[in-house]
Amino acid sequence: MSTFSQTVPELVAWARKNDFSIQLPVDRLAFLLAIATLNGERLDGEMSEGELVDAFRHVSDAFEQSTETVAQRANNAINDMVRQRLLNRFTSEQAEGNAIYRLTPLGIGITDYYIRQREFSTLRLSMQLSIVASELKRAADAAQEGGDEFHWHRNVYAPLKYSVAEIFDSIDLTQRIMDEQQQLVKDDIAQLLNKDWRAAISSCELLLSETSGTLRELQDTLEAAGDKLQANLLQIQEATLGRDDLHFVDRLTYDLQSKLDRIISWGQQAIDLWIGYDRHVHKFIRTAIDMDKNRVFAQRLRQSVQNYFDAPWALTYASADRLLDMRDEEMTLRDEEVTGELPPDLEFEEFNEIREQLAAMIEAQLNVYRERQQPLDLSVVMRDYLTQFPRARHFDVARIVVDQAVRLGVAEADFTGLPAKWQPINDYGAKVQANVIDKY
């Protein structure tokens, strides 16, 4: 998020001095959203008191509140919002009794979050990234040209601080809103499954696929522009090397690099977490279907046994010959691997099986480093592990090793801001970029 120039005591004293207080019950929040919606339809951005009362009357009807005291309650709500600095009131001697109201920046910020920011748009994100790329390219070119302190402030620092950083904050806010929407979708799915899971299957599938598609769309757009943005930031950082007077530019560049890395990293992590949740829901549905079938069969069998003397029956079973997979003799003579596509369920079970076994074994072996307080070099440890598995398993094993290693501790070198060197971990070109973990 944006960095603040004020300290915590200064902000606390400022809030106390101005007596800031916000209380927005659901009906008042709905009233504020109605004001913002109607205000957006006006070119001048102004509303009269009568228009505010009409908006309040509509909200009051929606909440089934009394119609007899609408005018009085509307007047109280308007005065309360003016007092909370959500609305500004303007009066004049020429038009006494007819005040003009405008939303304050605080009111716009609250309504913008609830109305505009919740509307995810790939086009909007693409335009934001396009603007960021243009601003970064211009700043990188200005940094390569060099100049006096005024040149660096105007052509490098200002675009980074007041354009790039703000757009990064907007993208970060979009991700946080997506996090909240994911939780709402999970709640909706839980309610659907608790009511009637048979009727809820199609609705759950729709919610899962829509959320997965939105997350993937967001991440693909970010990754497509991420490398280019990082390259421009590195150019600016290289231009400031050896210049002690440009520490403010170097610090801002480092903050932007960290923010961009965090945005892209969290986007991928959110996708991984959602995939895990998606599989969990499908596993629950499959289990529910199996349990339901077994329950129906057991109930019918119990009734048949109880009513045997009234309605005798006979049980017939068949044991068919097993089907053998016969392959062509020519295929056995070839030295090619004959494979086929596994169903997604089997692939998931196969991955879970190896993950559970390896995770426990790797966790026990890596704990030795923490107990002995020995530095843990991921490149060396991963190379030793990967030699024990076929090439097809290298990615899964490496991922498990990294997951278990980062739980043990951190590398002090990560706090220096310098990137780690790429180290090979197998004989097929795979590499890892990680500092030595030395703080547990």
Swiss-Prot record:
Role of this protein: Involved in chromosome condensation, segregation and cell cycle progression. May participate in facilitating chromosome segregation by condensation DNA from both sides of a centrally located replisome during cell division. Not required for mini-F plasmid partitioning. Probably acts via its interaction with MukB and MukE. Overexpression results in anucleate cells. It has a calcium binding activity.
Leucine-zipper, as annotated region: 208-236
Assembly information from the UniProt record: Interacts, and probably forms a ternary complex, with MukE and MukB via its C-terminal region. The complex formation is stimulated by calcium or magnesium. It is required for an interaction between MukE and MukB.
CDD domains named among the record's database cross-references: MukF_C, MukF_N
Gene Ontology terms: biological process: cell division; chromosome condensation; chromosome segregation; DNA replication
Coiled coil: none
The name this protein goes by in its record: Chromosome partition protein MukF
Family affiliation: Belongs to the MukF family.
Alphabetized Gene3D superfamilies for the sequence: Chromosome partition protein MukF, middle domain (1.20.58.590), MukF, C-terminal domain (1.10.225.40), Winged helix-like DNA-binding domain superfamily/Winged helix DNA-binding domain (1.10.10.10)
GO MF assignments: calcium ion binding
InterPro entries for this protein: Chromosome_partition_MukF (IPR005582), MukF_C (IPR033441), MukF_C_sf (IPR038198), MukF_M (IPR033440), MukF_M_sp (IPR036141), MukF_WHTH (IPR033439), WH-like_DNA-bd_sf (IPR036388), WH_DNA-bd_sf (IPR036390)
Cellular localisation: Cytoplasm, Nucleoid
Gene Ontology CC annotations of this record: cytoplasm; nucleoid
Keywords per UniProt: Calcium, Cell cycle, Cell division, Chromosome partition, Cytoplasm, DNA condensation
Matches recorded under NCBIfam families: PRK05260.1 (NF003615)
Highest rank taxon of the organism: Bacteria
